[in-house]
Amino acid sequence: MTVERLENGVIVQRNTNEIEISITLDTVHGKLEGSTGVNFFDHLLNTFCHYSGLGLRVSTCESKDGILHHLIEDFGISLGLAFRELFDYTKVRRFGEATVPMNEALVGCYVDLSGRPFFQKNFEFSVEKIEDMPVEGFEEFMCGFVNHARITVHFFKFFGKNDHHISESAMKSFGLAIARALEGSEKKTTKGVID
């Protein structure tokens, strides 16, 4: 994996026996450019970008073994590393939270840019796929992102039956929580460092 810093962004390239990914994460555009080849995953990524205010350009996203699990997980790894490289967690608010309704679904997201990776959600999906994306991809993406961004993320589903609505409500709340955590603040940590 290689990382290249830009003025307002980071390029991450990841090439394994399973996938080849090249992405740029920036603080300027606030939208997704390009495609992962998985339409619903693209929809979730664009949702995250819109609500977080971050820009994501996908230059390359190819599966060498045809297994979506690997592609989605490795995309999360790449994006998480880009996020970690782009932001200094000691210079932002650090904590963020948001709760977002979408029709019958209501999901909250709670974020800590702590330097300590942890992911938890209190819901499971009731179907195997949402559109063209295996539902296990949601958790694989989030775990890849969280572990390499080194942040804590909790999702709490208050209500919801439709898996499309639940996943989109979750991603909207994640984007908003990240945006709030990235705001400037004088209060970061009582121990003086984030590691």
From Swiss-Prot:
Stored HAMAP family: HisB
Protein name per the record: Imidazoleglycerol-phosphate dehydratase
Compartmental location: Cytoplasm
Reactions it catalyzes: D-erythro-1-(imidazol-4-yl)glycerol 3-phosphate = 3-(imidazol-4-yl)-2-oxopropyl phosphate + H2O
SUPFAM superfamilies: Ribosomal protein S5 domain 2-like
Cross-referenced InterPro entries: IGPD_sf, ImidazoleglycerolP_deHydtase, ImidazoleglycerP_deHydtase_CS, Ribosomal_Su5_D2-typ_SF
EC number: 4.2.1.19
GO BP terms, alphabetized: L-histidine biosynthetic process
